[in-house]
Amino acid sequence: MIKVEDILRAYRHGFFPMADSREGTVSWCQPYQRAVVPLDSFRPSRSLRRVIGKKRFTIKINSVFEQVIRACSQPRSTGQETWLSEEIIKVFLKLHRLGVAHSVESWQDGELAGGLYGLSMGGAFFGESMFFFRSDASKVAFAWLVGYLKRKGYLLLDAQIMNPHLESLGAIEIPHEEYMVQLERALGKKISFV
């Protein structure tokens, strides 16, 4: 069973957990190329700026963390496995109760429409996963998160492993060595997420 201390130690050293399936073995990942979102240069796409401007979604923090992480754990398509095992979910629920793991949620018409969750340590936010029930909901939550982190003085938004969706949101890849320098600098800051 993964312990809270294991997670905190791993993240401080550039590792993160990933399961091979819902009930599968948990591995510790430290990719050579790390996906990060440059907070200073982030600019939402024109289409996302239009969606944000329509104010279709209301953003909340930490109001339904467990719902968010469980929605993130659902396979994206039929037959697709998830990397979020029950073991990882349970330890992140503990981290949330300790004030380390957080959710950013998009709500529409009183219903959860999408969102994301991650871990906050010092001036680093480790984005774990996103989901949506309604189109653009997770993108709006993500754009809100970037602005929030900038206002709070965060230095690093770690997106972990690049994929086309993250790339469309402005993530870039940096070498492991550069990531570790940014991580050490960010962990040296004292910032409270909420």
Swiss-Prot record:
The keyword Cytoplasm applies. Belongs to the L/F-transferase family. GO terms for biological process: protein catabolic process. InterPro entries: Acyl_CoA_acyltransferase, Leu/Phe-tRNA_Trfase, Leu/Phe-tRNA_Trfase_C. One of its GO terms (molecular function) is leucyl-tRNA--protein transferase activity. Keywords: Acyltransferase, Cytoplasm, Transferase. The keyword Transferase applies. SUPFAM superfamilies: Acyl-CoA N-acyltransferases (Nat). The lineage of its organism: Bacteria, Pseudomonadati, Chlorobiota, Chlorobiia, Chlorobiales. Its main location: cytoplasm. GO terms for cellular component: cytoplasm. It holds the Pfam family Leu_Phe_trans. It comes from Chlorobaculum tepidum (strain ATCC 49652 / DSM 12025 / NBRC 103806 / TLS) (Chlorobium tepidum). It catalyses: N-terminal L-lysyl-[protein] + L-leucyl-tRNA(Leu) = N-terminal L-leucyl-L-lysyl-[protein] + tRNA(Leu) + H(+); N-terminal L-arginyl-[protein] + L-leucyl-tRNA(Leu) = N-terminal L-leucyl-L-arginyl-[protein] + tRNA(Leu) + H(+); L-phenylalanyl-tRNA(Phe) + an N-terminal L-alpha-aminoacyl-[protein] = an N-terminal L-phenylalanyl-L-alpha-aminoacyl-[protein] + tRNA(Phe). It is found in: Cytoplasm. It comes from the Bacteria. Functions in the N-end rule pathway of protein degradation where it conjugates Leu, Phe and, less efficiently, Met from aminoacyl-tRNAs to the N-termini of proteins containing an N-terminal arginine or lysine. This is Leucyl/phenylalanyl-tRNA--protein transferase. Its EC number is 2.3.2.6. It is an enzyme of class 2 (transferase).
